[in-house]
C-alpha cells in the first residue's frame, strides 16, 4: 500500500492511497470462498455450487464490499502511521476501478490545528471580592416577600413598582403601526418590559384617566421600521394595583422549608443559598475573563467541520428549549449560531491544549466537591450524589467541568490578577449580563 499526504488549503488535507491489485484479488477470493459455503442455487447442494457460478452471481457485490472495506481500513492505518488527526467525516473519492490493476483513491478532510499557547502571562483578570452582608440578606427577604405578594386595587397615582391594566394605541405621524395596539394589557412596572419612556409616562396618573405618552424607539429596536422613530401612545388607564407584602409569619416562613418557622432560620437558609450563588458567580466571572483573555492572546485556525458540528448541537438545544424536534432544529438558520459555534470550538481547542500540555487529569477530590456542591441545593443531597455516581454520562460531564476548572487555575497562575471589592447585587447583575 502506497500513501501520500498533502495539504490542500489551510487545515485541509488529502490522503492518496494505492491498493495493490494482488491485495484486492486476495480479499475478493477469500470472500467468494466464504459465500460459496452458504449460497443456495437451484440444482446444486449447499456448499457445492461451482466457484465460477458464485463469482458470476455475487462477484460484483463482493468486489464493492471489499473495496469499501479496504478503503476504510487502509485510511485508518494511513492516518495512524502519519499521525494525522481528522475533524469530522472524511470525504472518500475513489478513481475508476479496473480489474487486475492497482486501485487508487483519495480521502479529503480537515485536521485539528497545531496550537502553541502564548502570552498567557498577558491575560488580565479582575477577581471580585464580595461577602454576603446582612443588608444583602434583607434585600433577598424583601424579594421573597414581593414574589409572594398579592395585588390590591389602588386609588392613588401610579408609582414605580405598581401594576397597571391599560389599553394603548401607538401611532407615528398619525399612522398606527403593527404591534402598537393592545387592550386590557397588564404591566408590572419596573421590569423594563416596555420601551424607554412608556412606564415613566404612566407614573403620576390615576385609574380612569386617558392621556397620551410621547416616546422614541431605541436605535437598536428589533423592528427595522421603528428604529429611532418618535411615536405617541394613546393610553386608557383602567386599573392601578399595589403590592400587599406578606408578613414574615411562622406560616409564611414554613413555605420555604424552614421547619421551626423562625425568622433566624429563614435568614440562615437564605444566607447559605446566597453564599453558594456568590461562589458560583465569582467562579463564573473569573473563568469568563480567563477565557476571553485566552482567546484574545491566541489566534486559532478553526476547522469548518468542527464549527458545522457545533452549529447542529446549538440548533438542537434551541429547538428543545421551545419544544421542537430534530427536523425543526435543523431548519433553524445556521447563521444564527455560527459565531457562537465558532467561539465554542476555539475555546474548546485552547482549553484542550492547556489540559494536554500540562498533562492534567480530573482530580477525584474536585469531582466529588463539584457533585456535593450541586447536591447541596436539593432537599436530599445524598440522593442526588447517588444519582450522579450511577450515571456515567453525568459523571463524564462533571469530570470535564473539573478539568476546565483546573485549566483555568493553571492559566491564572501566570495571569495578571487584581482584586476589586464589589457587592453581591452588582456582581450578580454582571454575571447575568454576561
Swiss-Prot record:
Give the originating organism: Proteus mirabilis (strain HI4320)
Please provide one cellular component term from the Gene Ontology annotations of this protein.
cytoplasm
Q: What is this protein called?
A: Trigger factor
Listed Gene3D superfamilies: 3.10.50.40, Trigger factor ribosome-binding domain, Trigger factor, C-terminal domain
- Give the Gene Ontology MF terms in alphabetical order: peptidyl-prolyl cis-trans isomerase activity; protein folding chaperone; ribosome binding
**Alphabetical UniProt keywords:** Cell cycle, Cell division, Chaperone, Cytoplasm, Isomerase, Rotamase
The Enzyme Commission number assigned here is 5.2.1.8
Has UniProt tagged this entry with the keyword RNA-binding?
A: no
Q: Which PROSITE patterns match?
A: FKBP_PPIASE (PS50059)
Cited function: Involved in protein export. Acts as a chaperone by maintaining the newly synthesized protein in an open conformation. Functions as a peptidyl-prolyl cis-trans isomerase.
What the entry lists under SUPFAM superfamilies is as follows: FKBP-like, Triger factor/SurA peptide-binding domain-like, Trigger factor ribosome-binding domain
Amino acid at each position: 500500500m502506497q500513501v501520500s499526504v498533502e495539504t490542500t488549503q489551510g487545515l485541509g488535507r488529502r490522503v492518496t492511497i494505492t491498493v495493490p491489485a494482488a491485495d484486492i484479488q486476495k480479499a475478493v477470493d477469500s470472500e467468494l470462498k466464504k459465500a460459496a459455503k452458504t449460497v443456495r442455487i437451484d440444482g446444486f447442494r449447499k456448499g457445492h455450487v461451482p466457484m465460477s457460478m458464485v463469482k458470476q452471481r455475487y462477484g460484483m457485490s463482493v468486489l464493492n464490499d471489499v473495496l469499501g472495506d479496504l478503503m476504510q481500513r487502509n485510511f485508518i492505518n494511513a492516518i495512524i502511521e502519519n499521525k494525522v488527526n481528522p475533524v469530522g467525516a472524511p470525504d472518500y473519492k475513489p478513481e475508476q476501478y479496473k480489474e487486475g490493476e492497482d486501485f487508487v483513491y483519495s480521502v479529503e478532510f480537515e485536521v485539528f490545528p497545531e496550537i502553541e499557547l502564548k502570552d498567557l502571562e498577558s491575560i488580565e483578570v479582575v477577581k471580585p471580592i464580595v461577602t454576603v452582608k446582612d443588608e444583602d440578606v434583607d434585600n433577598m427577604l424583601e424579594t421573597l416577600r414581593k414574589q409572594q405578594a398579592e395585588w390590591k386595587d389602588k386609588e392613588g397615582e401610579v408609582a414605580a413598582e405598581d401594576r397597571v391594566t391599560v389599553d394603548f394605541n401607538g401611532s407615528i405621524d398619525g399612522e398606527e403601526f403593527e404591534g402598537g395596539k393592545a387592550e386590557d394589557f397588564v404591566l408590572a412596572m419596573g421590569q423594563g418590559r416596555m420601551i424607554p419612556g412608556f412606564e415613566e409616562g404612566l407614573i403620576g396618573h390615576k385609574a380612569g384617566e386617558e392621556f397620551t405618552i410621547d416616546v422614541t424607539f431605541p436605535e437598536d429596536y428589533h423592528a427595522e421600521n421603528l428604529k429611532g422613530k418618535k411615536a405617541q401612545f394613546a393610553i386608557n388607564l383602567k386599573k392601578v394595583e399595589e403590592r400587599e407584602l406578606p408578613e414574615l409569619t411562622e406560616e409564611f416562613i414554613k413555605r420555604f422549608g424552614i421547619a421551626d418557622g423562625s425568622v433566624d432560620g429563614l435568614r440562615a437558609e437564605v444566607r447559605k443559598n446566597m453564599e453558594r450563588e456568590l461562589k458560583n458567580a465569582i467562579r463564573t466571572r473569573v473563568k469568563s475573563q480567563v477565557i476571553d483573555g485566552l482567546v484574545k492572546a491566541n489566534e486559532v485556525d478553526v476547522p469548518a467541520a468542527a464549527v458545522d458540528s457545533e452549529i447542529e448541537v446549538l440548533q438542537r438545544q434551541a429547538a428543545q428549549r421551545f419544544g421542537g424536534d430534530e427536523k425543526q432544529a435543523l431548519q433553524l438558520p445556521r447563521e444564527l449560531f455560527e459565531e457562537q459555534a465558532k467561539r465554542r470550538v476555539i475555546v474548546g481547542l485552547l482549553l484542550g491544549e492547556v489540559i494536554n500540555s500540562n498533562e492534567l487529569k480530573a482530580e477525584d477530590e474536585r469531582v466529588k466537591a463539584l457533585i456535593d456542591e450541586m447536591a447541596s441545593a436539593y432537599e436530599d443531597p445524598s440522593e442526588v450524589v447517588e444519582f450522579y455516581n450511577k450515571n456515567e454520562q453525568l459523571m463524564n460531564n462533571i469530570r470535564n467541568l473539573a478539568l476546565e476548572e483546573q485549566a483555568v487555575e493553571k492559566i491564572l497562575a501566570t495571569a495578571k490578577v487584581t482584586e476589586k471589592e464589589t457587592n453581591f447585587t452588582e456582581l450578580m447583575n454582571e454575571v447575568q449580563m454576561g
